[in-house]
Amino acid sequence: MKIGVFDSGVGGFSVLKSLLKAQLFDEIIYYGDSARVPYGTKDSATIKQFSLEALDFFKPHEIELLIVACNTASALALETMQKHSKIPIVGVIEPSILAIKQHVKDKNTPILVLGTKATIRSSAYDNALKQQGYLNVSHLATSLFVPLIEENVLEGELLETCMRYYFAPLKIFPEVIILGCTHFPLIAQKIESYFVEHFALSTPPLLIHSGDAIVEYLQQKYALKKNVYAFPKIEFHASGDVIWLEQQAKEWLKL
């Protein structure tokens, strides 16, 4: 099965990594709109337009399924993309909510949603969680993480300063953290360590990773089996510097 994976930049690598590990597909076309990253600071109309242009990119490739590996595009443009497409298009929000339902049974569990300004402003996660009966949901726009990750700043004082800026004011410890941007799993261990150290925790918070969630979702929805395609063909495309994107993929995905 030939599929496409679309993200605003390198954040979709976290989803791609989970897909490669699961070995669900034999061919993957990855498109990163790196010339216009980040999406999270842009308005809804612009995000929809960029997402439709990404959809146009995939048409000559004759893919059978498209994964929108961008929370901002999933929150604001998924329905628009689906209306303009004859193939199935899957976002990352619904799979993450299903993962919450599977792993978090107590509806009063404190849940923190991290995301870009656009994703948080859309209330997509908040509304979906409330529809499932979760009552203790808070959110935090952490958009500054995106440019840091795009520049491969995955550790060090700059990242620590950024985490302190966002997390130090928190008064309630979240038992569950939704990484509501596909860039964020690339610093998941740092986020987990911050909460363990600064909240003096014996048990780290449960991090919901959209990459792992979407693998479970695809298996259930399309009856896909793991470990079928050990060496899928992967093509990388970008609106910006594709050589840079390929270099980042080799480093982060160990290709």
UniProtKB/Swiss-Prot annotation:
Binding annotation for substrate: D7, S8, Y39, G40, N71, T72, T182, H183
Catalytic activity: L-glutamate = D-glutamate
Database matches in Pfam families: Asp_Glu_race
GO molecular function annotations of the record: glutamate racemase activity
Active-site residues, as the UniProt record annotates them: C70, C181
Function: Provides the (R)-glutamate required for cell wall biosynthesis.
Protein's name according to its UniProt entry: Glutamate racemase
Organismal lineage: Bacteria, Pseudomonadati, Campylobacterota, Epsilonproteobacteria, Campylobacterales
